[in-house]
Amino acid sequence: MAISSTERRSKNVQVFVEKDAVETSFAKWAQPGHFSRTLAKGPKTTTWIWNLHADAHDFDSQTSSLEEVSRKIFSAHFGQLAIIFLWISGMHFHGAYFSNYSAWLTDPISIKQSSQVVWPIVGQEILNADVGGNFQGIQTTSGWFQMWRAEGITSEVELYWTAIGGLAMSAIMLFAGWFHYHKAAPKLEWFQNAESMMNHHLAGLLGLGCLSWSGHQIHIALPINKLLDAGVSPQEIPLPHEFLINRDLMAQLYPSFSKGLAPFFGGNWGEYSDFLTFKGGLNPVTGGLWLSDIAHHHLALSVLFIIAGHMYRTNWGIGHNMKEILEAHKGPFTGEGHKGLYEILTTSWHAQLAINLAMMGSLSIIVAHHMYAMPPYPYLATDYATQLSLFTHHMWIGGFCVVGGAAHGAIFMVRDYTPANNYNNLLDRVLRHRDAIISHLNWVCIFLGCHAFGFYIHNDTMRALGRPQDMFSDKAIQLQPIFAQWIQNIHLLAPGTTAPNALATTSYAFGGDVIEVGGKIAMMPIKLGTADFMVHHIHAFTIHVTVLILLKGVLYARSSKLIPDKANLGFRFPCDGPGRGGTCQSSSWDHVFLGLFWMYNSISVVIFHFSWKMQSDVWGTITPDGAISHITGGNFAQSSITINGWLRDFLWSQASQVIQSYGSASSAYGLIFLGAHFIWAFSLMFLFSGRGYWQELIESIVWAHNKLNFAPTIQPRALSITQGRAVGLAHYLLGGIGTTWAFFLARAISIT
């Protein structure tokens, strides 16, 4: 039988969606626990509500179909995007309706940013600080104003339109989440098409994303910011679309615009160097990176990503194949190499998520450090409270993501790992070497902990004995960070040598000039000495202990000498049953639980170090004749080399603002400081307590209720060991972060 060309074409067409996959049922959604036969029966004990929360998003426990799990995750992503767009819309609406953005634009150095006014109900109006420009409101430290300035937003009307756009996008995302689960749900092979996904994400999301941002900066943000920097009033600047459609207007600011696209197609790209620059350093007017450098950077990235997005083999017979790349990746000591990893990454979303969380967490920490060393937005560097907030925010986000990576890595090991499919590949070989890896890492932690704290204890002892000449310090026994200083110097010398076209250093943290804006220091060389060497070894210690706990949780997720059948017990279990003492707190969940405490330790030391170092050695004022006055007078080098110095000259000294905030516009921080301490202390009640104590207490209370014929229909139960730890951990972190937030902001707002 001859096949027609139409039939042949239809056979080649791949159908990647299933129509009307799941009916839309409000009645089903209204039933709590509809996803579980057990939970749908309703509560018999108070444990039901805990299980409801634990399992609502644990799609693995609701179905064994990988396709169904994939669809639920995909749909949930649209819901997440809807919330993000709604949040962004709300931020812009606040900027449009409640803020002093227009006033701030006219004088961003002396006017503080505010986008919320508290109503006077019972005296709360005390929180409305005088932020300058005839405006009273809560001082905000989010960095939105600086970002809006960099985008070229000059009026509240533009913020309104952006807010409406965000609202519309939020609605579209909600619709898309419903549509792609109920009406046109992708099939499993669509989710597993790694090459197509890589091409679209690289060329589409990253490539076109960078290109559109670069285009916006060139055509809208650059001309508007150039006029603002020159002192032109925001009201007198043409509307954004005029720069877009009027080439003559652009040519007045950037002459190369008059030449059109001829230099581009002629390969004479240097003609565009008036708006695509490679200056390096910071704009002396705003203290931020040159926006023309940023536009150039994103244009270059877009080219790289668009090329990268054509790298993988899809419908045509050219390009890379992910499975082939992985299976060809073999070294002399790595057995089968990456064989089997392709199957893992296309069937286990926990494995995929683990890698993504680890990468995104690391990226967030990198962003935190770049935000102060290379401030990207105008007038960000001189807004010290915002700088401290952004650093702290990105460090916490990074810490949580990295721990999340370990959590999902362990879940993958328990639920998705198949030993038979991973014989002698890299993953199998790491698992077989786990005792060597963990014991060596443990030795490193002991070494770092003993030596790092030993330095401090030595210094505290010598200072107490009145022997400063025997201390580790820049003035006595020096421990100079010579490698860090060498790296700083390499970067300082790069312009004109290894970076021949750069006009200034990448960051003035490495050395060079003092950049000041309106008499406030934006950035200056950050000198590193003995104090930094010592605290960096505390960083190394806390980070290595966090990694030790998390890595042990992943490598011993399926089995250990103590519990050989751990994989059968699952990701989360309290102990290995009755009659096996000493097996509690050995599940992968418990490793994540312990790892979060050490993550909290790690990040706390980092943000304390940053806050004090910047106040001591960078932030401050400079007079016209060049005399510099730092906020804490350069006391970091001599005070931070003892534990007593950290307690007295940082924690106690800088807590004065939050402790004495009552009766001022910062009084909310005083209350948060107090309240967050209570939340933190409340956590200890769960962390230092046994379940049996509470069960006995509950039973005596239930007895009293029964005596009065007032017994509840839902039987009260004490929290399980795991639930108690989860509640304790949540309050410990919330209380600790809330306390730090209040301490930092009350201090930072007073010095900004």
UniProtKB/Swiss-Prot annotation:
GO cellular component: chloroplast thylakoid membrane; photosystem I
Membrane-spanning ranges: 73-96, 159-182, 198-222, 294-312, 349-372, 388-414, 436-458, 533-551, 591-612, 666-688, 726-746
Residues in the signal sequence: none
Record's keyword terms, sorted: 4Fe-4S, Chlorophyll, Chloroplast, Chromophore, Electron transport, Iron, Iron-sulfur, Magnesium, Membrane, Metal-binding, Oxidoreductase, Photosynthesis, Photosystem I, Plastid, Thylakoid, Transmembrane, Transmembrane helix, Transport
Residues given in the record as phylloquinone binding sites: W694
Cofactor descriptive note: P700 is a chlorophyll a/chlorophyll a' dimer, A0 is one or more chlorophyll a, A1 is one or both phylloquinones and FX is a shared 4Fe-4S iron-sulfur center.
Subcellular localization, as worded in the UniProt entry: Plastid, Chloroplast thylakoid membrane
One Gene Ontology molecular-function label: 4 iron, 4 sulfur cluster binding
Any GO BP annotation: photosynthesis
Binding site for chlorophyll a': H677
Topology versus the membrane: Multi-pass membrane protein
Superkingdom of the source species: Eukaryota
InterPro entries reported for this sequence: PSI_PsaA, PSI_PsaA/B, PSI_PsaA/B_CS, PSI_PsaA/B_sf
Annotated catalysed reactions: reduced [plastocyanin] + hnu + oxidized [2Fe-2S]-[ferredoxin] = oxidized [plastocyanin] + reduced [2Fe-2S]-[ferredoxin]
Record's function text: PsaA and PsaB bind P700, the primary electron donor of photosystem I (PSI), as well as the electron acceptors A0, A1 and FX. PSI is a plastocyanin/cytochrome c6-ferredoxin oxidoreductase, converting photonic excitation into a charge separation, which transfers an electron from the donor P700 chlorophyll pair to the spectroscopically characterized acceptors A0, A1, FX, FA and FB in turn. Oxidized P700 is reduced on the lumenal side of the thylakoid membrane by plastocyanin or cytochrome c6.
Subunit structure: The PsaA/B heterodimer binds the P700 chlorophyll special pair and subsequent electron acceptors. PSI consists of a core antenna complex that captures photons, and an electron transfer chain that converts photonic excitation into a charge separation. The eukaryotic PSI reaction center is composed of at least 11 subunits.
Family classification: Belongs to the PsaA/PsaB family.
Protein name: Photosystem I P700 chlorophyll a apoprotein A1
Classification lineage: Eukaryota, Sar, Stramenopiles, Ochrophyta, Bacillariophyta
Gene that this sequence comes from: psaA
